[in-house]
Amino acid sequence: MATKTTVQKAIDTTSTVTPLGTLLKPLNSEYGKVSIGWGTTGVMAIFMSLFAVFLTIILEIYNGSLILTDVTLQ
C-alpha cells in the first residue's frame, strides 16, 4: 500500500537540531503575535523612505546618462 509506505517513511525520519535552527527559533516563536500599538511600523516607514531615496538617486543617474550633448539631428 502506497499510503502505508508514505506514513511509515514520515514516522521513520528524525529531525536534526542545527545551530542555525536553534538561533532562529526565537523568531519563529513570535509567529502570530500582534505587537502592542504601532509595533515596527516606524522602522518600516524609515526603510521605505530610504528605499525611495535610493530609487530616486538611481533614476537621476539613469536620466543623466540619457542626455546627449552636442548631438545635432538633421
Curated annotation (Swiss-Prot):
Gene Ontology cellular component annotations, sorted alphabetically: chloroplast thylakoid membrane; photosystem II
Membrane topology recorded in Swiss-Prot or TrEMBL: Single-pass membrane protein
Keyword Thylakoid assigned: yes
Key word Transcription regulation present: no
Transmembrane segments: 42-62
Pfam families named among the record's database cross-references: PsbH (PF00737)
Keywords noted in UniProt: Chloroplast, Membrane, Photosynthesis, Photosystem II, Plastid, Thylakoid, Transmembrane, Transmembrane helix
InterPro entries linked to this entry: PSII_PsbH, PSII_PsbH_sf
Top-rank lineage group of the source organism: Eukaryota
Molecular function, one GO term: phosphate ion binding
Subcellular location: Plastid, Chloroplast thylakoid membrane
GO biological process: photosynthesis; protein stabilization
Subunit architecture: PSII is composed of 1 copy each of membrane proteins PsbA, PsbB, PsbC, PsbD, PsbE, PsbF, PsbH, PsbI, PsbJ, PsbK, PsbL, PsbM, PsbT, PsbY, PsbZ, Psb30/Ycf12, at least 3 peripheral proteins of the oxygen-evolving complex and a large number of cofactors. It forms dimeric complexes.
PANTHER family referenced in this protein's UniProt entry, alphabetically: PHOTOSYSTEM II REACTION CENTER PROTEIN H (PTHR34469:SF4)
Its biological purpose: One of the components of the core complex of photosystem II (PSII), required for its stability and/or assembly. PSII is a light-driven water:plastoquinone oxidoreductase that uses light energy to abstract electrons from H(2)O, generating O(2) and a proton gradient subsequently used for ATP formation. It consists of a core antenna complex that captures photons, and an electron transfer chain that converts photonic excitation into a charge separation.
Recorded family membership: Belongs to the PsbH family.
Protein name: Photosystem II reaction center protein H
Organism expressing this protein natively: Bigelowiella natans
Phylogenetic placement of the source organism: Eukaryota, Sar, Rhizaria, Cercozoa, Chlorarachniophyceae
